[in-house]
From Swiss-Prot:
Pathway: Nucleotide-sugar biosynthesis; UDP-N-acetyl-alpha-D-glucosamine biosynthesis; UDP-N-acetyl-alpha-D-glucosamine from N-acetyl-alpha-D-glucosamine 1-phosphate: step 1/1. A motif (Substrate binding) lies at residues 130-133, 332-333. It comes from Arabidopsis thaliana (Mouse-ear cress). GO terms for cellular component: cytoplasm. CDD domains: UDPGlcNAc_PPase. It is found in: Cytoplasm. This is UDP-N-acetylglucosamine diphosphorylase 2.
Length: 502
């Protein structure tokens, strides 16, 4: 007998009622960033989002995601707010803070030279080169250090500076050979580039085999960039999918050294002192033993070489004391009215505000660590009004910058060391044909100085053009500051222009 069967009907509507409800749509990365940017009043960067291709949208998202928005917002707000605020009055630098050329004795110079060479021999000096700029004003898109100013040797600024390091290393090794076994001396060279100069600078050094230096004694690191802003603090868009950015000034070196962990690298190598300078001075005495010895002797936290202003209205920044008994710092020439710029010291006859900043500095490593931490917390940047590339063409906007001299207010002690302009300061900033700081003016300063060295060493010159327009070039591999030239020059005649080399 057939068993009865039971059919069970399942209503589909009943099944549907037990399914979980659909999830709400997830916010797109674009929408999430818009909400974040609203917190900082910068959501306009997405105003052209609907017109962008998928690839362009990805580029814009990456550009924004790479920003430290809280930090940048703090910098913008604090920097804009600081405009127009009263600042402490300035005073002239006290006389006892400056070692002048005329008061320096031969014994002082010899003592400091030996002290500096000893510290270099012991590996206590590192050198930082500020080399983020391009040679745009010189008519070149290459890093400025690649520039050849037209010396007889045809050497670039980078090569001249590298060879000065080689010379100092040799001098330190020779000076200490009597007291210690002769051994190679190595000065670590840290070169700060920018996003525009980093790769070409590295390629230039590699193609020239590091100019005789060991590759592992040269370290390249990049300074940071910050968005360019309008006068009301809004980001400027260079294209519909990218922000307009600019390097954060040569004072960005402090943050860059910290973020690259190079301050730790220096400490691990036993470096105690750091020489810091700009690339565009062809007469710079890199790793100057005398300056280093003076710095050590004074037990200062920071020091700077200074030159006297050529005339009261010269457009240079000068060292001052900020506030009654306050720290030494640098002010731009625009902060000095005509009466202050022309005021003289009744005792010395010098201008009261005469000590020009020429970006030749020395720091202890301990102080650099303090500065890197201090400037990271100090969100007030200099606002430089510039033409900024934008989607509407070049517009007037603001670049956010720190300057190398922003460190000095943090220093418990700063010592100033006067040098002669004609011996140590030949800037290369403007194209030939300009009124000052050209490759031609720098070339002549080098030739004239080196000609004096050769004549002092017993050499003679012949020349087909007036001597004021020519001269000789002494290779840094022969002499650092005019020393040890007698064996090469005495009784010999050189036809200018030429290079004297080993």
């Amino acid at each position: 007998m057939k068993e009865p069967t039971t059919e069970i009907e399942i209503e589909t509507s009943a099944v549907a009622t037990i399914l979980p409800p659909p999830l709400p749509p997830t916010a797109s990365p674009h929408q999430a960033l818009v909400e974040r940017l609203k917190d900082y009043g910068q959501e306009d960067v997405f105003s052209l989002w609907d017109e962008l291709s998928p690839e362009e949208r990805d580029l814009l998202l990456r550009d924004i995601e790479n920003l430290d928005l809280p930090r940048i917002d703090r910098i913008i707000r604090c920097s804009l707010h600081s405009q127009g605020l009263p600042v402490a009055a300035i005073e002239p630098v006290p006389e006892n803070c400056v070692s002048t050329v005329e008061e320096r004795t031969k014994e002082d110079r010899e003592k400091w030279w030996k002290m500096g060479l000893k510290a270099i021999y012991e590996g206590k000096l590192g050198v930082v080169l500020l080399s983020g700029g391009q040679g745009t004003r010189l008519g070149s898109s290459d890093p400025k250090g690649c520039y050849n100013i037209g010396l007889p040797s045809g050497k670039s600024l980078f090569q001249i500076q590298a060879e000065r390091i080689l010379c100092v290393q040799r001098l330190a090794s020779q000076a200490m050979s009597e007291a210690s076994p002769t051994r190679p001396v190595t000065i670590q060279w840290y070169i700060m580039t920018s996003p525009f100069t980093h790769e070409p600078t590295q390629k230039f050094f590699k193609s020239h085999k590091y100019f005789g230096l060991e590759p592992d004694q040269v370290t390249f690191f990049q300074q940071g960039t910050l968005p360019c802003i309008s006068k009301d603090g809004k980001f400027i868009m260079e294209t519909p999918f990218s922000l307009s950015k600019a390097p954060d000034g040569n004072g960005g070196v402090y943050t860059a050294l910290k973020s690259s962990r190079l301050l730790e690298d220096m400490a691990s190598r036993g470096i105690k002192y750091v020489d810091c300078y700009g690339v565009d001075n062809v007469l710079v005495r890199v790793a100057d033993p005398t300056f280093l010895g003076y710095f050590i002797d004074k037990s200062a936290a920071s020091a700077a070489k200074v030159v006297r202003k050529a005339y009261p209205q010269e457009k240079v920044g000068v060292f001052v004391r900020r506030g009654k008994g306050g720290p030494l710092t640098v002010v731009e020439y625009t902060e000095l009215d005509q009466s202050m710029a022309s005021a003289t010291n009744q005792q010395t006859g010098r201008l009261q505000y005469c000590w020009s900043n020429v970006c030749l500095h020395m720091f202890t490593l301990d102080f650099l660590n303090q500065v890197a931490n201090g400037l990271e917390k100090d969100s007030v940047y200099h606002l430089a009004e510039k033409k900024i590339p934008s989607i509407n063409g070049d517009i007037v906007g603001l670049k956010l910058e720190q300057f190398i001299f922003d460190c000095f207010p943090y220093a418990p002690s700063t010592a100033l060391f006067e040098v002669l302009r004609e011996e140590e300061f030949a800037p290369v900033k403007n194209a030939n044909g300009s009124n000052y700081d050209t490759p031609e003016s720098a070339r002549l300063l080098v030739l004239r100085l080196h000609t004096r060295w050769v004549i002092a060493a017993g050499g003679f010159l012949t020349h087909s053009v007036p001597l004021y327009a020519t001269g000789v070039e002494v290779s840094p591999l022969c002499s650092y500051a005019g020393e040890n030239l007698e064996a090469i020059c005495r009784g010999r005649t050189f036809h200018a222009p030429c290079e004297i080399s080993l």
